[in-house]
């Protein structure tokens, strides 16, 4: 484990699998952890940001290790069900071409099965300045975005807690 900029630890990320989409519990090579698979065809990098149990403090920022076709993916041994996380995606800022990549914006995984945190003002979280839509927003929004939570669907079903 090394330290990324800002002193956030960076666990080792292995290639993992490009499926299923989202961040899910996984057993790869006999080790338990989480596998992330995020389609982002125009991205230059995708980061998985892990947070503490309350979702307040970022505990690790992990650059996904592999890309298969248009899917960025990686496996991190250790974390499992209940882990809170978000995504950051790097790429071109070209609004005229429909590309508004902004790694200062913490994103919600569209495949997450659980969110924790306030949703009331979520519609205000855009990656550009409202008064100047062709300029990227220069402020990190992590403190205002709900955290995704890794869910073990099989365990939820065994416990009778999953709603399908």
Residue ranges of model-derived segments:
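The feature marks proteins involved in alpha-glucan
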Residues: 1-30, 58, 67-71, 75-164
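Beta-strand signatures of extracellular beta-sandwich domains
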Residues: 47-49
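Structural beta-strand segments of beta-rich domains
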Residues: 32-36
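Short proline/glycine-enriched turn/loop motifs at strand-loop junctions of beta-rich domains
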Residues: 39-45
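Ser/Thr-rich low-complexity repeats and stalk/linker segments
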Residues: 62-64
């Amino acid at each position: 484990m090394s330290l990324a900029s800002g002193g956030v630890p960076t666990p080792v990320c292995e290639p993992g699998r490009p499926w299923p989409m989202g961040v899910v519990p996984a057993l790869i090579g006999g080790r338990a952890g989480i596998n992330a698979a995020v389609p982002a065809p125009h991205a230059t990098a995708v980061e998985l940001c892990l947070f503490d149990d309350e979702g307040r403090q970022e505990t690790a920022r992990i650059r996904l290790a592999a890309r298969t076709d248009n899917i960025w993916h990686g496996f991190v041994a250790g974390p499992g069900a209940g882990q809170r996380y978000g995504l950051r995606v790097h790429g071109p800022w070209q609004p005229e071409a429909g590309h508004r990549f902004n790694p200062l914006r913490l994103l919600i995984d569209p495949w997450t099965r659980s969110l924790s945190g306030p949703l009331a003002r979520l519609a205000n979280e855009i990656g550009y300045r409202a008064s100047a839509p062709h300029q990227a927003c220069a402020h990190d929004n992590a403190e205002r975005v709900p955290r995704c939570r890794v869910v073990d669907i099989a365990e939820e079903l065994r416990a009778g807690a999953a709603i399908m």
